[in-house]
Amino acid sequence: MDRLRIHGKTDWNMPFLPCTPWLCCAFLLIASTALKAADPKETTSPPSTPTIPSAATAAKGDPAASPWPGDRVDQWHGFVRHRFAVDGATAWVVEPHQAAPGKPWSWCLEFPDAFTDRTGVLQLLEHGFHHVHLEVGNTFGSPRALEQFEAFYQVLQRGGLGPKAALVGISRGGLYAYRWAAKNPERVACIYGDAPVCDFKSWPGGKGTGKGSAGDWTQLQRYYGFATEAEALAFSGNPVDRLAPLAKAKVRLIHVVGDTDDVVPVTENTRLIESRYQALGGQIQVIHKPGVGHHPHGLDDPAPVVTFIRESFRDGKP
C-alpha cells in the first residue's frame, strides 16, 4: 500500500488513495471554496446602517455623538452642555431636551451665568431653544471679538442650528450683541438688551452722567486699537450709531432697564436706541423697573421676554 507524505515526511500509518479524476476535481473544488472564504477581498456583507447617537450617549461624552469639534460634555442647569474651542476661545452649546422645529437658539454674548433665573434663557431651553456662548472675555465687542463671533457662527451652522439667533446682551454685553448684529442683521431674529451698554462713551467712558470705569475705558481703547482718547470719542460704530441695518432687516428689540441705573444710565443708552429705532420704523419694546438700579438684571417673572423671543421665531419668521 502506498503511504502519504506530509511536509516531506512519510506517514506509514495513513493510507494514500490513488487520485482518480473525479476525486481530484472534488478536492480542488473544496480547496477553492475554502480559500475564498478565507480571503477578505472576496467576502461581502450588507452595508452597515449609520447609528444616530442619542442624547444619553452624548451625555456620556462619546465624541462621535456630537456635531461639535473636540467636544467635552457636562451639565448646565440640568441640560446637556457641549464645550469646545473656536478660534482660540472656549465655546459652549446647551441643548434642550427636545429641540423645537427649525432649531431656534439664543446667544448670551457676555455674563452667560448671571441671573439665569431672571433672563428667560432657562425657559427658552424648556421650549426647545438651544443656548450658546463664546468666551471672548472683557473685550467690549472689539473688532477681534467680532471675528471670533463670525467663526463661532459658522460652527453653529455646520452643527445644524437655525440661521437666525436671539441675541442676549446683558450690561456691557449690549456692545457685543449690537455690534455683531449690525454687521450680520440677516442672522438675527431679535435682541434682548438687559441694562445694555449702547454707547461706550457712557460706559466705560463715563462722559455723561454715569459712573464710568477708568480701567475698563483704558482697556477698551487698547482692544479697539485707538491711538488716543479723542479717536475713541469720535468713533461712529457704537450701537446707537448702527441701527439702520437692523431696522431694514426688521430685527425686533426688547430692553429691560432699571430707571435709577447710574452705571449704564437709561437716558444715554436705551432711550437713544428707542427713539432712533422708532424713527427708522423699527419695532422696540422697553420694560421699565421703577426704583431699580443696574442690578438685579432680568425680571422676577421673565415671561414677557420669553414670549417676545418666541414670537420672533413664529409666523414665517426665522
Question: What does each model-found stretch correspond to?
Answer:
Residues F115-V132:
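Short amphipathic alpha-helix adjacent to the substrate-entry channel of hydrolases
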Residues P101-F111:
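Short beta-strand element of the alpha/beta-hydrolase
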